[in-house]
C-alpha cells in the first residue's frame, strides 16, 4: 500500500540500483552481508545474483519478509525490528556470531513523532537519535555502527540533506571524526514519491587518517566520479562539489572574504508583518516591486523567500515598507548600502555560490532563509561600490526586462566579478554553469 509505505518512510530500491550498488562496493567473496531493513529484498537478491553466499536480512514487515524469502530462496531472513533492538540482539536473532563485514540497504526516512516511534527502553539510544535529527534513518545509521565489524563497511541510501541540515550535525561530526567516508554518490531525486533528493553514502566503521572522500554523480544509469576531497577538509557540513573548478573557487572565496552575516549590521530574517498592505513574496520582482514604485530612502532589502535555480534571487530595495512572512528581509545602514547588497545578491556569482555551496547543488525549490544568506562571501569594495549602486538605481528606473534592463544586468555581473577579483576564465565558467540551470528568460544572450 503506497500510503502506508509513505507514512512509514519506506521507499523500496529497484533491482537496477541495488545491483549497481552491490557491484560498486566490490564486496569480496566470503564476506558477510546484512540488510537490516531489507523490505522485499532487492539488495538481498542482488547480492545473491552476484555470487555472495553469506547474505542476511531482516525487516519489521512480515509481508515484505515473506516476499523477500520467496524471491531470494534463502533462510537467513527474519521478521525483526532492527531499530528497536540493539546490535547484539539483532545478530543473535540472525544466528550471527559476530558483527558483519557489510551493512547495506535503504533504511526508512521519516521524522520521529507521536505516530512514528522507536519501541525501545534504551534511553541513551533514543537520546542520541533525538539529538542527531530525530529521524528513522538516523536510528538506522546508529544501529549500523553496532552491526558492522571494526573494519566493516556501511552503505546506505539516505536523504541528501543529511550532509548540510543543522539538525543532523551531531551525527555528521561523529562520522567525520570517528569513521571514514569512502564515497558519496549524489543520485538526485531517485524516488519520485519522496520529497527531497538522495545520496548513497558508504562508510568504514573505523577512522583512517589522511583519507580522501570519492564524490560521484549519477547519470545514464552509471555512477560518474567527479573528484576526491580530503575528509579533513570538512568539519561539519559536507558539500558535494561537482568538479575541481568548483572546489577551487569555493576555497578561494571562503578564504578571501568575510561572510554577509559578519558584515551586515542589521536584521536578516523573515518578515513579520500581518498587515494587509505588507509586501508579499509575489509582490517582488528583480530590482523592483510589481505594484508600487521603488522607495528612494530607507534601510531594507526584500527578497522572495522561495528560491528556484531557474530564476535565482528575486529582490528589491524596499525603503521602510513592511514585509510579510513570505519575504526575507535584510536591513543595513542606508539606501546605498542596501542597493550595494541588492546588486551583489542578483549577480550570477552570488547565485552560483548560493546554489552550489549553500543549497549543496539541490535542484529543488529552496528558501532564502537567513542561515543561507549569511554564508555568502561579502566585501565592501571601495573601487566598485558606487558603480554597483548606480547600476542598481538604473535598473530600478529602466523598463523591466527591456533590452536596456538586460544590458544593465550584464554590466552589473561584470562589476561584481571585478569586485571579487574573479578573472575571465572563472567568470566564463560561472556564467556557463548558471546558464545551464537558469531559465532562458533571464539570459540576455538568448533574448537577443
Residue ranges, per PLM feature:
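N-terminal, positively charged/glycine-rich alpha-helical extensions of SAM-dependent methyltransferases
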Residues: 1-3
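Signature of N6-adenine DNA methyltransferases within the class I
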Residues: 6-7, 12-20, 24, 37-45, ...
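Proline-centric
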Residues: 21-23, 27, 110, 144-148, ...
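Conserved class I S-adenosyl-L-methionine
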Residues: 30-37
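Conserved acidic residues
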Residues: 31, 101, 300
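Conserved residues in the N-terminal Rossmann fold of short-chain dehydrogenase/reductase
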Residues: 79
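Non-catalytic DNA-recognition/assembly elements of restriction-modification systems
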Residues: 104, 226-284, 380-448
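Polybasic, glycine- and aromatic-enriched phosphate-binding surface used to engage nucleic acids
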Residues: 244-386
Amino acid at each position: 500500500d503506497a500510503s502506508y509505505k509513505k507514512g512509514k518512510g519506506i521507499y523500496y530500491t529497484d533491482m537496477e540500483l541495488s545491483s549497481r550498488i552491490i557491484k560498486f562496493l566490490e564486496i569480496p567473496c566470503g564476506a558477510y552481508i546484512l540488510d537490516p531493513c531489507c523490505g522485499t529484498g532487492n539488495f538481498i537478491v542482488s547480492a545473491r545474483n552476484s555470487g555472495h553466499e553469506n547474505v542476511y536480512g531482516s525487516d519489521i514487515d512480515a509481508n515484505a519478509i515473506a516476499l523477500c524469502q520467496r524471491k531470494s530462496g534463502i533462510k537467513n531472513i527474519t521478521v525483526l525490528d532492527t531499530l528497536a533492538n540493539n546490535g547484539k540482539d539483532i545478530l543473535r536473532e540472525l544466528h550471527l556470531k559476530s558483527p558483519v563485514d557489510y551493512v547495506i540497504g535503504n533504511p526508512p526516512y521519516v521524522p520521529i513523532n507521536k505516530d512514528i516511534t522507536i519501541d525501545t527502553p534504551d534511553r541513551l539510544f533514543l537520546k542520541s537519535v533525538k539529538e542527531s535529527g530525530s529521524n528513522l534513518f538516523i536510528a538506522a545509521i546508529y544501529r549500523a555502527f553496532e552491526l558492522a565489524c571494526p573494519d566493516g563497511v556501511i552503505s546506505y541510501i539516505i536523504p541528501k540533506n543529511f550532509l548540510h541540515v543543522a539538525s543532523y550535525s551531531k551525527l555528521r561530526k561523529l562520522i567525520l571524526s570517528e569513521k571514514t567516508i569512502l564515497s558519496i554518490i549524489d543520485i538526485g531525486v531517485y524516488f519520485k514519491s519522496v520529497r527531497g533528493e538522495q545520496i548513497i553514502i558508504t562508510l568504514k566503521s573505523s577512522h583512517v587518517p589522511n583519507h580522501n572522500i570519492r564524490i560521484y554523480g549519477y547519470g545514464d544509469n552509471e555512477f560518474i566520479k567527479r573528484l576526491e576531497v580530503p575528509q579533513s577538509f570538512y568539519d561539519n557540513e559536507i558539500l558535494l562539489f561537482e568538479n575541481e573548478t568548483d572546489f577551487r573557487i569555493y576555497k578561494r572565496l571562503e578564504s578571501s572574504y568575510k561572510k554577509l552575516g559578519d558584515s551586515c549590521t542589521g536584521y536578516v530574517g523573515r518578515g513579520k508583518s500581518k498587515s494587509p498592505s505588507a509586501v508579499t513574496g509575489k509582490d517582488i520582482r528583480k530590482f523592483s516591486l510589481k505594484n508600487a514604485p521603488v522607495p528612494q530612502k530607507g534601510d531594507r532589502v526584500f527578497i522572495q523567500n522561495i528560491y528556484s535555480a531557474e530564476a535565482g534571487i528575486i529582490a528589491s530595495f524596499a525603503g521602510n515598507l513592511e514585509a510579510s512572512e513570505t519575504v526575507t528581509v535584510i536591513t543595513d545602514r542606508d539606501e546605498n548600502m542596501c542597493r550595494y547588497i541588492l546588486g551583489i545578491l542578483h549577480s550570477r556569482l552570488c547565485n552560483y555560490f548560493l546554489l552550489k555551496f549553500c543549497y549543496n547543488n539541490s535542484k529543488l525549490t529552496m528558501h532564502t532563509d537567513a542561515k543561507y544568506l549569511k554564508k555568502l562571501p561579502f566585501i565592501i569594495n571601495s573601487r566598485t561600490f558606487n558603480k554597483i549602486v548606480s547600476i542598481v538605481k538604473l535598473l530600478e528606473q529602466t523598463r523591466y526586462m527591456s533590452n536596456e534592463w538586460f544590458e544593465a544586468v550584464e554590466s552589473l555581473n561584470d562589476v561584481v566579478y571585478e569586485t571579487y577579483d574573479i578573472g575571465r576564465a572563472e567568470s566564463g565558467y560561472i556564467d556557463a554553469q548558471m546558464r545551464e540551470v537558469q531559465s532562458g528568460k533571464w539570459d540576455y544572450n538568448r533574448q537577443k
